[in-house]
Structure formats: structure tokens, C-alpha cells
């Protein structure tokens, strides 16, 4: 069974209830056969190990390149330290295929083989940009992948491994321009709790704007952003106080009184 159909304990940090390909808590990736006490996320039964053939990306060939690239890239220190930790422990060739059932793109010419989602997902950056160029005549002639173009990614800390190791290696392998920098941020929590539909802490942006001005939320998030990967907590009591004191209060204080108006 592909990784997302398996759950268990992370073999790296011991976090429970993690998927079979990566850990949300420590960010590590691993083979689904490495996860501790695995169960099927569909049936809850214990999976049986069977042999199957896969395609691999020879990531080990890029180990020296990745070390040098990280050294010369101004990635946040906490992320860079974690990436170097992964590199120093020895990276393995990357399994880029999954067997059916899977939700990725089917590999042409193969029987029930799919590209692993983190192999094809970053390619979407290239495909989306190419599509944008096709419908916008003003930028159609620009080569966005030459060495003079700067490329920046803004991502969540849970996908740093894929964007800071796999993605640069892919770009290097096809001789495309590398990211100028990658900025990672933490998760968004609600009143100190992880977003969850079952716990009623999941908020859609479309629902939020029905009650509040989106500019208030942008300001609140901007006031909490930093160069770290700490989670940002949307605490509604703090949100109310901050908006009232910083924005609404300031507006009222600086507004002219009736006698001052012309």
C-alpha cells in the first residue's frame, strides 16, 4: 500500500499517528516499511509486506551538490541545521513511484504505476508558469529559468525536506535555474490548537471574511511573522485586542474632532 494509506509511529522521533512516507512533527521522510506499528489508514488492519518494482531518483549523486548549495543559500538557520543533519546521516536514493491505488499521475507505459506526488508536485511550478506565459503575451518571450532570474519559495516547514533537497536536485538534474532562497514558516493554530474539523477548530477563509475585514487578519499575521519557523496562533481574544488597539484605536485617536474639521 502506498504511504498515505499507512499510519504508525515515526521511526525517527517516535511521534504517533504519522503517515507512511513522512513525519509531520519532525519533518523526516522514510520508507513505509520503516514505520513502527503500521496499520492501514482505511481498514485499521496490519499491512503485509510484499515485493514490488519501483523507479528511483539517484539522489545520492547530488549529495555533494546539495551540501554546497545549502552552504551558499541564505535559508533560515533552523531549517539549514535540520537539512544538514539529514545530509550528515546519509541520504538515500529516492523512490519516485507508487503502486495502485494512488492519487498521482499514472506513468505512461507502466502497469498501475504512478509518480509519487512529491516528484510531480513541484513540477507544477514549471507547468503553471509555462501556462501563464502562454496566455499572457507581455511575458511570453521571457525565459524565467535562466540564471539571471531570481526564484523564491514560501512554504510550510513540513515540506522543507522536499523543497530544499529533492527539488534543487531535480532542477540541477535538468539544468534549470535553482531557487535563490526558500522561506519556511510554521503552522497556523486556532486558539492554541491544531486546525481540525472534528475538533471544530477549522476555519475557512470564505467564512472568516463574512464576519471580519480580511485586512485585519493580514495585519495580525504580519505582526506575528518572524524569521523563525514557530507556529502562528490565531487567538481570537488576542486578535480582538490587537485590532482594537493598533488599528481601530489608532484611527479614532488620529481622526480630527468636529471642531478641528474645516
Whereabouts are the PLM-identified features?
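Cys/His-rich microdomains that often coordinate metals
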Residues: 17, 30, 47
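Structured secondary-structure scaffolds
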Residues: 3-4, 9-13, 22, 36-255
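Acyl-donor-binding surface of acyltransferase catalytic domains
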Residues: 27
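A short, hydrophobic C-terminal helix/tail in secreted or cell-surface proteins
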Residues: 256-262
